[in-house]
Amino acid sequence: MVLIRVLANLLILQLSYAQKSSELVFGGRPCNINEHRSLVVLFNSSGFLCGGTLINQDWVVTAAHCDSNNFQLLFGVHSKKTLNEDEQTRDPKEKFFCPNRKKDDEVDKDIMLIKLDSSVNNSEHIAPLSLPSSPPSVGSVCRIMGWGKTIPTKDIYPDVPHCANINILDHAVCRTAYSWRQVANTTLCAGILQGGKDTCHFDSGGPLICNEQFHGIVSWGGHPCGQPREPGVYTNVFDYTDWIQSIIAGNKDATCPP
């Protein structure tokens, strides 16, 4: 466990610009130690990959564009410098993607469901997050979190994950901001219209939490992050709940919404 922890610390510290689609929390504050019990770290031998969300003891949800070879998942992490005694590491046993996902668009149907090689034990710093019972309404206040950049134009990453509150915005805001590409109906548009708070580099795959339910997956957004009228685009978890539940129940041929 000590060797795994040392490796994980080194990997988390090796953050870089390698993934142009990854996002981070800019304009936030340090999360409280028990505020992110469902937050997962994905990493491999090349470094930190993405965030993820624990939805039960055997399954994690993250962004499809976070997929990589030979990654591991780390649970219960708060500080990169101080070990939590209940931290746990797992390998993916199986990975599931939408079968109708466009192969030439890395953020199309940007969701990956991961079955763990063994169950994670709930603890002081580890607990699953509930799937949504209904979609969030425009204006809802939601929370983002992650170890991504705290200054969009500099390689500055926090020791502990940062959290920030943002709002669900009308889809038209994102369609106007990103008129050069399609903003899918199965996404959420979320942020602050005047800018200053946003997910940013290396927050990809992490959760958007509204009313203590798992509503969104960090997918993509403006560059640099946190600019006025350039909010983040999040996979709408509610639209994929039937697919998630079908896969967990053993129906590996389940399809995603169009």
Curated annotation (Swiss-Prot):
Keywords of the record: Disulfide bond, Fibrinolytic toxin, Glycoprotein, Hemostasis impairing toxin, Hydrolase, Plasminogen activation, Protease, Secreted, Serine protease, Signal, Toxin, Zymogen
PROSITE patterns: TRYPSIN_DOM, TRYPSIN_HIS
Annotated active site: H65 (charge relay system), D110 (charge relay system), S204 (charge relay system)
A molecular-function term among this protein's GO annotations: toxin activity
Propiece residues: 19-24
Domain of life: Eukaryota
Glycosylation positions in this chain: N44, N121, N185
Keyword Cell division: no
Subcellular location: Secreted
Signal peptide extent: 1-18
Tissue: Expressed by the venom gland.
Family as reported in the entry's similarity comment: Belongs to the peptidase S1 family. Snake venom subfamily.
Subunit note: Monomer.
Role of this protein: Snake venom serine protease that activates plasminogen.
UniProt protein name: Venom plasminogen activator GPV-PA
Organism name: Trimeresurus albolabris (White-lipped pit viper)
